[in-house]
């Protein structure tokens, strides 16, 4: 039997400093040999690295005469230590893009040397991280050793789920509808492999699409519903791989027009590419090509990517029981870098994040620049996730304190100033303006004339919602679904406000759900508003795309919010509406018209997060007990640091919208 060789090159590309003890580290899942058979240990030492002078990434090189290969696991000896080396052999199936030569892409930093870490444990600068730059090259040929195929997403056999058993495929299929069966087939067909291991799902996988644009990439926000669907189905490997690979991409040098953003920025997307190796016929290497917004329409920075990454990291631990991932030094450092970027001091007087238009799911010009609700809700959720996962020590105490302070201030700000119901709108209608005082009622100098005519008749007597944006002399009264749902899921709103959001959706079902759940925002910008605010965007015409279009991917978030608020039947109703049409309409990205009757005029078909959103919603309905792992209840400890609690006025705290005592 002819054996083929594999070459793997792993070159870390950090933006800060990393430290790993060589003697006890288990980088890539094995202990390095004492002998110099494969590695020159003299070159493996701790060093400070300037990110501006390094441009390297994780590459997986394979030498294969044909490109049909799948992963084999062979046990060989590395200087006396056991290890697995995956070699190219045989043929691949599905969307396999490569052969993984090293079982785990990122290192297991938890097996570090205590002595090596002691000198850095008291480092007060939480942005500091330490890494040992490594380049591993291995060429080995072995035969007759038992092999095991890896990288399959479907059976869940390789998922790291502890004592949680994986359901048999036959039992699972018996309980699935035809729509679900097709959805699972499509979702698994959208999986992208890197070096033989699944690392994500493409944005869309329409076989009839001749112009893929960037829909053949793995987007962080798009992959989140796919990750939830896989984990709820007992498959965690793809999520773990995704989290680790995107973490490595975080450290890449990011430059657009000679300017580099902060090192904590996560990419909007990445793509697996391959390039031929010089001097080797038939051999090539795979590499990840990230996009940090430099190729996006409008060149917008993906602010929400890092927030989604932290949220997904927590969900991975909750659903799989594998908390070792979030405890790793490299992962802990990734969390800190994102937090540093979000908590950086600036000119803003508010605890909300100031962003440009198009920096989240609404990624085109839609008048959401400033402090959009979607970003604030995800920011709050990410802060709560990070606070749970951060390992508290002398080096992180100041960061944890900053997180707690921001959580308290942010929840107060959103609950107090973003919330509207019939009572609040009537209050705004009677506002005095031009108030110059620290105790002013109309703190943002909102003119009553800003209340739109549609809102006066639309707002129900019961219920309410969080407005889309707030800035001086400006309130965006549009209802943005994703932001309101995450306000409920994360308990950014208090109990009454969360109930009010769900009541409003139920009351305004014909506007927000109708023929296809759910409206991304309501109402649409029309006529002069559309021309001025969107710049006459031909894709965001009224009741289309982000301007009032209906997006089925929001189903899973709606289902999670419904389960939290005890409205499971409402979620089932919405899923049933979608299930009637999605398969027939070929899983479109979005729907047009006020009631969501038409498939979007520029909608991609077989959109992965449409498929995954539907499947995740179905799984949550089947397993509502798991939903409790994914949402948050009110944190009453935050109320102790409320600014109202610091007031000398004893009665002021009772009036604070953040304070809603727990129900008996």
Swiss-Prot record:
One of its GO terms (biological process) is circadian rhythm. One of its GO terms (molecular function) is sucrose alpha-glucosidase activity. Disruption phenotype: Delayed germination time, reduced plant growth, delayed flowering and reduced oxygen consumption in the dark. It is found in: Mitochondrion. It is an enzyme of class 3 (hydrolase). Belongs to the glycosyl hydrolase 100 family. This is Alkaline/neutral invertase C, mitochondrial. It comes from Arabidopsis thaliana. The lineage of its organism: Eukaryota, Viridiplantae, Streptophyta, Embryophyta, Tracheophyta.
